[in-house]
């Protein structure tokens, strides 16, 4: 379902995630150093607290919205998420076509196809305007947040258990962390927060769109087509075997 959301271009897709905690310790990175004189990091570690990162990412444009925080409780995450989503919705054009209630409900239910456990949709639904990919965390399933998303025309798409790799926000968070922290030794959580948000602002000056699958996926699919699966296990051969052929 999430892969289908990435592939379509009718509804905007945003992804949400949290990264961290990041500690006040040296982060390894790449340096130019004279031969025999490697970079030396301080061995002392003073516990000054940690920082986390809240992320909203739009793969189609590459735009990212980031906020650094000390804690990531629902009381902190939900208001930030709601404010950012309202700003995103305000920038979207109003739906050009007015659908009947039945057609509108089918648009929402289309994104629940194939799920074994489905969230109950409200009786009255606004026009569907945005798809939001979220990790399957308890904080993302609170009734107040889910009902707010529905009221705003946002359909949450939750990653399955062990399926966080379906959330493209994971990739942008890894990139921003490397740009912000690698090769540095932050002394305070506030310094970590400032560097993470600065890295996001720098990224947004020239964002790079993300695409699902791409050339690597096409190569993997071609490789699988050249393989011949065997029964009984996950084994395969590079040429077909005829079951009636004698050894």
PLM-predicted stretches and their roles:
Residues 37-46, 151-168, 184-186:
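RNase H-like polynucleotidyl transferase catalytic core
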Residues 15-17, 56, 62, 81, ...:
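Mobile genetic element proteins and their domesticated derivatives, centered on retroelements
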Residues 14-16, 130-135, 157-160, 211-214:
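Short beta-strand segments
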Residues 194-247:
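C-terminal domain-tail junction helix/linker
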Residues 72-73, 101-108, 132-143, 161-166:
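Acidic, metal-coordinating catalytic cores used for nucleic-acid/nucleotide bond scission
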């Amino acid at each position: 379902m999430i892969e289908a959301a990435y592939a379509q271009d009718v509804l905007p897709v945003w992804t949400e995630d949290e990264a961290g905690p990041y500690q006040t310790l040296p982060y390894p990175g790449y340096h130019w150093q004279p031969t025999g004189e490697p970079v030396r990091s301080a061995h002392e570690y003073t516990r000054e607290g940690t920082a986390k990162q809240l992320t909203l990412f739009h793969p189609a444009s590459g735009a990212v919205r980031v906020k650094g925080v000390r804690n990531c409780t629902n009381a902190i995450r939900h208001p930030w998420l709601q404010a950012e989503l309202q700003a995103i919705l305000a920038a979207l054009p109003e739906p050009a076509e007015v659908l009947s209630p039945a057609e509108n409900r089918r648009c929402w239910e289309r994104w629940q196809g194939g799920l074994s456990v489905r969230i109950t949709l409200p009786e009255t639904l606004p026009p569907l305007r945005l798809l939001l990919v979220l990790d399957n965390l308890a904080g993302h399933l609170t009734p107040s947040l889910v009902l707010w998303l529905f009221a705003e025309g946002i359909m949450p798409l939750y990653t399955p258990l062990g399926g966080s790799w379906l959330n493209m926000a994971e990739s942008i968070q890894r990139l921003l962390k490397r740009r912000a922290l690698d090769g540095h030794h932050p002394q305070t959580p506030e310094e970590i927060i400032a560097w993470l948000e600065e890295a996001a602002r720098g990224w947004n000056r020239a964002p790079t769109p993300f695409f699902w699958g791409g050339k690597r996926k096409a190569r993997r699919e071609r490789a699988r087509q050249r393989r011949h699966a065997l029964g009984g296990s996950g084994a395969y051969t590079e040429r077909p075997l005829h079951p009636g052929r004698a050894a």
